[in-house]
Each structure stands twice: as structure tokens, then as C-alpha cells.
């Protein structure tokens, strides 16, 4: 007698049950366990505990096509509509199958009819193009909410207090009054001719070469730039209140860093140049061959990274103050006082950044990282230069001379002048040599006698002056002219973001 086929053979869903083994019960049991395990994670909060699918009675995972269903019935309904499969479904038992989580894969037609009966909407099933468009819209909404959240968080961040505004005004005025060419540096700059600094001609003892013509050009502008850094520091009350010994140590430590920062914020990506002292635009190789060595690479890379920040004069000024009041300089006497001063500038800096409301995500921590890069690039960029004179800086000795890296005081200056045979004519920050008439000394002597080297006094003392007194630019016509050009208004409380990026300069 012919056996009546069981309901299990009625058209099953090949996508859900394609790997059935001959032992149907065992396979279904494993499938149920797998589904239960995979769906045991996130459950929407609007569902009751252990709420069941309205189609098959399995554990529901949310609203799908207007009904509370499980993942299996959601997928079955979506595939059926997208591929237009329901006209091909059939039932061997007159559409009388009972659909539950055990039998749901045994009859596609009855399962689909139950989906329709409980209210699942066919019009909510999207084709591939509509589904892609919907996902894109979802991503756009998420991005919009993220930006709105960022704006709300910016509005809630603290802005400068009245006391901090006073600190900000002083630092900004100190920077602008010692900032050559001000915000007009692009209009007033002159490009160093391409033939200068491109062909190193003087060999150094360490094997590197220096272009004397480029070195001569840098000498003319870097020496006044050092004086401007000193003048900037002296205009900060917190700095002026420190002992002279600490002032000297801080200036020796930060001079190169501040000058590098002032040059970096005047990086021009169009010409790939840095503008030194607000007047001379130089290329990377020109700066390198002029005596700065590998440090020039660090300054150019810093300029490229800072160009995206669009810093204004106040932000450059506060960043310089943070670099100046650094407690990691060895030999400081008033470490606690300097640390408190730096914290005050850091807090004012952070609040001013909040006030400007930059559109760059995480602007403040990123800017602090750049501040550390200024220091680390100067301290460690040249570490790979094996045993180069000038230590880990990677700066040639004559480059250190120009940048005021090693400042010696009055009696030492006169002693070195006598060693060079030019007593009384060489002043200011000079390189402290280990022995008379070293190769580096002979090069300095050659440069000085050629009229190339002319250093200003930045920090010195003699028998007739107060010990450790710092020279001022009050009588320097060049610096006075620079100060007269600083006509931009200081930021008000709250100030208007003046926005011309790259406000700093040597």
C-alpha cells in the first residue's frame, strides 16, 4: 500500500534548510540551537521578556515589516518578496499546515500566508537599490546627530574667565609686538633665490656641508629673531617675576622651539616654503644647507601639520607661553612657580580654544600633541645623526651659534673673543667650545672675519651691568618698527576670532 507522504516533505525553504541531513529531527534541533544561540544577544527594550514571534512562536527579536517576529521569519518574508517566490509556493495538504518553530521550514506557502495574515507588509520590503539608499540615509542621519552632539558639547565647554582674558590679552600683545611683519607676511615676504642654499660648498668636520651664502642670509634675520623671542618672554609678567637664573635657563631651552613654531605657522603649502622672520621664504634644502641640518625637516613637517589648524595670533602666543614655561629644563630654581604658570597658560589656552569653536574633532588634544612635537622634534630629530657636533639636535655648531642654543655670559664671551683674535667685536649668544681653535672655532673665525657673522647680545653680563640682565629691544629700530606694525586689535572678552591662520612668525 502506498504510504501517504508526511508533511515534512512539503516544499521546504532551501535557504533555511539547505543542509538537512537524513535525520531531519536531529538537524532541526541543531538548527534551533544555533538560531537560539545567535539571537541570544541584543533584544530591543520595547519587547517583553521572552516575547514570541507572531508567525512561528520562536523568540522574537523586534518589529519587522510591521509585526513582531523572529529573525527567521523576517528573512523568509524578505526573500520571498524580493525574489517574487510566493507564486511558486504550493502545499500538498490544502493549505492547512500548522506553522510553529518546528514546522515553519516544511511548508513555504502556509508560512507565507501566515505572515500575511498576522499583518506583515509586503510594501515595506525594499529592493536592493532602495535598501542601499535607506542605509545611506541612516548613515547621514548618524553623521548629523554626531555633529549636533559635538556642537552641544562645544557649547557646554568652559570659556575663559575674566582673569584668564587678562592673561590672554597680555600674551597676545607680547606676541604681536614682537612679531615681524604681523599678519602681512605673505605680502611682504621675499623668496630666497633658488641658486642660494642648493649647492653646499664648505665641508664640515662631521662630513656634512654648509652653503656659506645661505648661512650669511640666515645670519642677518635669525639674530634679530632671537632678540624678539627674548622680548616676548620679558613682556610676560609671570616670566619677569622669576629669578634671572631661571629666566636664562628657560630662554636657552625654548628659544629654538619658539623660533621653530613661529616659522612653522608661516608654512605655505603652495610654494612649500617657510617664511623666516616674516620676510624671507626658504625651501627645505636651503634651510638644511644653511646650517640647520635635519632639524629643518622637523620644522617643515610641523608646518605642514599645523596648516590644518588655522591658528590665530592668540593661539600662537599662548602656545609660545606654554613652551616657555616648561619645567623639564634642568637647573631650574623655582620649579613649582614655573609649573603653576604653565598650568595657568594651559588652562587659558584650553578655554580660548573652546571659545573659538574649531570644527576639527578633538582639536584641543591634537593641538597639545603638536605642542609636544615642537619640543620633541628639536630634542630628538637629530638623534640619528651619529655623533654629530651639536648633540642630539642635529644642528651644525654654527647653526647653534645663530639660534642661540648655548648662551654664555659676559666673561666667557670675552674669553672666547680673545681665542678668536677678535676681542670686543663678537657679542651675544655664542657657542661654548671645548678647546681653543677647534675646527668649529676656525670656521666661526673665518665667517666673522668675512663679515658674515654678526650676533646680537641676547643674554649677557659684564662688570658694569647687573648680573644676568637681559637686553631689551626698546632701542632697536628694527624691533620697534615691527612693534609699530602690530596694529591688529587684541581679542575682546569674548573676542572675535580674527582667523587669519599662521599669525605667528620669527
From Swiss-Prot:
Subunit details: Binds DNA as a dimer; homodimer and heterodimer with RXRB. Interacts with NCOA3 and NCOA6 coactivators, leading to a strong increase of transcription of target genes. Probably interacts with SFPQ. Interacts with C1D. Interacts with AKAP13. Interacts with TP53INP2. Interacts with PER2. Interacts with PER2. Isoform alpha-2 and isoform alpha-1 interact with TACC1, but the interaction with alpha-1 is weaker. The interaction with isoform alpha-1, but not alpha-2, is decreased in the presence of thyroid hormone T3.
Q: What is this protein called?
A: Thyroid hormone receptor alpha
Task: Report NR C4-type zinc finger ranges.
Answer: 53-73, 91-115
Where is Zn(2+) 1 bound in this sequence?
A: 53, 56, 70, 73
Matching InterPro entries, A to Z?
A: NHR-like_dom_sf, Nucl_hrmn_rcpt_lig-bd, Nuclear_hormone_rcpt_NR1, Nuclear_hrmn_rcpt, ThyrH_rcpt, Znf_hrmn_rcpt, Znf_NHR/GATA
Q: Which GO molecular-function terms appear in the entry?
A: nuclear receptor activity; RNA polymerase II cis-regulatory region sequence-specific DNA binding; thyroid hormone binding; zinc ion binding
Q: Where is this protein found?
A: Nucleus
Q: Which family does it belong to?
A: Belongs to the nuclear hormone receptor family. NR1 subfamily.
Identify the residues that bind 3,3',5-triiodo-L-thyronine. 228, 277
Q: Where is this region: Modulating?
A: 1-52
Q: What is its main location?
A: nucleus
Instruction: Give the species.
Output: Sus scrofa (Pig)
Q: Name one GO biological process term.
A: retinoic acid receptor signaling pathway
* Domain NR LBD, chain residue ranges per copy: 163-407
Q: Does the keyword Zinc apply?
A: yes
Any Gene Ontology CC annotation: cytoplasm
Segments of the chain annotated as binding DNA: 53-127
Assigned keywords, A-Z: Cytoplasm, DNA-binding, Metal-binding, Nucleus, Receptor, Transcription, Transcription regulation, Zinc, Zinc-finger
User: Its function?
Assistant: Nuclear hormone receptor that can act as a repressor or activator of transcription. High affinity receptor for thyroid hormones, including triiodothyronine and thyroxine.
Q: Where is this region: Disordered?
A: 1-32, 460-506
Q: Which residues bind Zn(2+) 2?
A: 91, 97, 107, 110
Domain text from the record?
A: Composed of three domains: a modulating N-terminal domain, a DNA-binding domain and a C-terminal ligand-binding domain.
Amino acid at each position: 500500500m502506498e504510504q501517504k507522504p508526511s508533511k515534512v516533505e512539503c516544499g521546504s525553504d532551501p535557504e533555511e534548510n539547505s543542509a538537512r541531513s537524513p535525520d531531519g529531527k536531529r538537524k532541526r534541533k541543531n538548527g534551533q540551537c544555533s538560531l537560539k544561540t545567535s539571537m541570544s544577544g541584543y533584544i530591543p527594550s520595547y519587547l517583553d521578556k521572552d516575547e514570541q514571534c507572531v508567525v512561528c512562536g520562536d523568540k522574537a527579536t523586534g518589529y519587522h515589516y510591521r509585526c513582531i517576529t523572529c529573525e527567521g521569519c523576517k528573512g523568509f518574508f524578505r526573500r520571498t518578496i524580493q525574489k517574487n517566490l510566493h507564486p511558486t509556493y504550493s502545499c500538498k495538504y490544502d493549505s492547512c499546515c500548522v506553522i510553529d518553530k518546528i514546522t515553519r521550514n516544511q511548508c513555504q506557502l502556509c508560512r507565507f500566508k501566515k505572515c500575511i495574515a498576522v499583518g506583515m507588509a509586503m510594501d515595506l520590503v525594499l529592493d536592493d537599490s532602495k535598501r542601499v539608499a535607506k542605509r545611506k540615509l541612516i548613515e547621514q542621519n548618524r553623521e548629523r546627530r554626531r555633529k549636533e552632539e559635538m556642537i552641544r558639547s562645544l557649547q557646554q565647554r568652559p570659556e575663559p574667565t575674566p582673569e584668564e582674558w587678562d592673561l590672554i590679552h597680555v600674551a597676545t600683545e607680547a606676541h604681536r609686538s614682537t612679531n615681524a611683519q604681523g599678519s602681512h607676511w605673505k605680502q611682504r615676504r621675499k623668496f630666497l633665490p633658488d641658486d642660494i642654499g642648493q649647492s653646499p660648498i664648505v665641508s664640515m668636520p662631521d662630513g656634512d656641508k654648509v652653503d656659506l651664502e645661505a648661512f650669511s642670509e640666515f645670519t642677518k634675520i635669525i639674530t634679530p629673531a632671537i632678540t624678539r623671542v627674548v622680548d616676548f618672554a620679558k613682556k610676560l609678567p609671570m616670566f619677569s617675576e622669576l629669578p634671572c637664573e631661571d629666566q636664562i635657563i628657560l630662554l636657552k631651552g625654548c628659544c629654538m622651539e619658539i623660533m621653530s613654531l613661529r616659522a612653522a605657522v608661516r608654512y605655505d603649502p603652495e610654494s612649500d616654503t617657510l617664511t623666516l622672520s616674516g620676510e624671507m621664504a626658504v625651501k627645505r634644502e636651503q634651510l638644511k644647507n644653511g646650517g640647520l641640518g635635519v632639524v629643518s625637516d622637523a620644522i617643515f613637517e610641523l608646518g605642514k601639520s599645523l596648516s590644518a589648524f588655522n591658528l590665530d595670533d592668540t593661539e600662537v602666543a599662548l602656545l609660545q607661553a606654554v613652551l616657555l614655561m616648561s619645567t623639564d629644563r634642568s637647573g631650574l630654581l623655582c620649579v613649582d612657580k614655573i609649573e603653576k604658570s604653565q598650568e595657568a597658560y594651559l588652562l587659558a589656552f584650553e578655554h580660548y580654544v573652546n571659545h573659538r569653536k574649531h570644527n576639527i574633532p578633538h582639536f584641543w588634544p591634537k593641538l597639545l600633541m603638536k605642542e609636544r612635537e615642537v619640543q620633541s622634534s628639536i630634542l630628538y630629530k637629530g638623534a640619528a645623526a651619529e655623533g654629530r657636533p651639536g648633540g642630539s639636535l642635529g644642528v651644525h655648531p654654527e647653526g647653534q651659534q645663530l639660534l642661540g642654543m648655548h648662551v654664555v655670559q659676559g666673561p666667557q664671551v670675552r674669553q672666547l673673543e680673545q681665542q678668536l683674535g677678535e676681542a670686543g667685536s663678537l657679542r651675544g649668544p655664542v657657542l661654548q667650545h671645548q678647546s681653543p681653535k677647534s675646527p668649529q672655532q676656525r670656521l666661526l673665525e673665518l665667517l666673522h672675519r668675512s663679515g658674515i657673522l654678526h650676533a646680537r647680545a641676547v643674554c649677557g653680563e659684564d662688570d658694569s651691568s647687573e648680573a644676568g640682565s637681559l637686553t631689551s629691544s626698546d632701542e632697536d629700530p628694527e624691533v620697534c618698527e615691527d612693534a609699530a606694525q602690530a596694529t591688529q586689535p587684541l581679542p575682546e572678552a569674548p573676542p572675535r576670532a580674527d582667523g587669519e591662520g599662521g599669525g605667528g612668525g620669527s
